[in-house]
């Protein structure tokens, strides 16, 4: 039984539902609100995924921000990537790897190896780009997109965005920046998510923001 699932198309609404249900499950078991500084780490802990920081050499595509070792239930974060000093980039990266764990890893197969002493089974020894979050996302395959979309839904579920929107004008960058900080994401993450939901329209040449057809009142 392979640890890595073969690629298959997953509708966006299904990815969003899976991510939202996971977020709600984590929140329901806590007395305190999730901190924007550690949302993804807390969810990883809930899933019993360990996080380790160490250097990861670049490959032929470019820098690798992180990778996941399924049979070790471990996310490796590249300690040499300076962008991790920014909380939003760190949260997005960890959430991305969680997306791979949920969407692309056969967890039943992982359980068969979990008690073994082997470091990593053969299928994981070979480089698997979709298990690594490359900084150069423009080169990412479809499974990378799925994991990143999952990450956006996990960190910015619609019900959290509705809360964060209160008292803010989403057509003003000066309101979006603190909103992104409150959510624990980058401004780019937030812009992409709001555009995808149809809440805003952004003129990329002028950076002017307009209300989208689905923007909540």
Where would I find each of the regions flagged by the language model?
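Active-site hotspot residues in diverse enzymes, especially metal/ion-binding acidic/histidine motifs
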Residues: 1-217
